[in-house]
Amino acid sequence: MDSRVIEIRKHLKKKLDPMRFEHTLGVSYTCQALAMRYGYDLDKAELAGLLHDCAKRYDRPTMLEKCISRGIPVSESEERDPSLLHAKLGAWMAREKYGVDDEEILSAIACHTTGKTDMGMLDKILYVADYIEPRRCKAADLPRMRKLAFEDLDLACLSIMESILRYLGTLDCPIDPLTIAACNRMRAVAARSREQAAAGNGEAGPEKIKEENTVESVKRNGKTRSRGAGREKGRRYKNY
């Protein structure tokens, strides 16, 4: 366990409301479980989970004000909906208030709400853990998402992004372009993962099937030509 964890927990318990603190513990626990499943550093996963919502102690106007005063970039989407800023502000607080200097942890905290196009392992772990943690009960399709998270992290990440986009679409809410870009990128990543898995299992893709059919056809034609040549040769010997 990272030596800072106990003190951070104590501090967060004082600063966050009880429900938010319980959610934080659930995400931290789930991050560690996913880290064990996918061979990632447990301490880094735990810290990312603990601090991902550390800026949720502030209301929306205060988050916007703090980001502006600290020189944290604010997009048009974030200006319209400052609640999105808790991720960026949380990453800043993790560095400046809690002494975290690990770039993977800071990246995961900063993108856990919208995602991003070049998500690393910890980015995906935190993004998924935030959705499936044990205390969540209202998110869409939770049983399937929880199962999928421990089978295929990329596909789980994509499925959660698509679910969130569908939900936001029903509310007619503006969608952050980062989320759309992240989802499109994750579709490509998930498709590549499926292709690699299929290749590893010996499943043939379209080009492989075409190649095998061509080879088989040549073999069959070769046999036909050999048998035909043999019969013709036999007839010549007989006539002779």
Question: Model regions: which residues?
Answer:
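Divalent metal-dependent catalytic cores for phosphoryl transfer on phosphate-bearing substrates
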Residues: 10-14, 37-159
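Generic N-terminal amphipathic, Lys/Arg-enriched alpha-helix
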Residues: 3-17
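Charged phosphate-binding loop/patch that engages nucleotide di/tri-phosphates or the phosphate backbone
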Residues: 167-218, 226-239
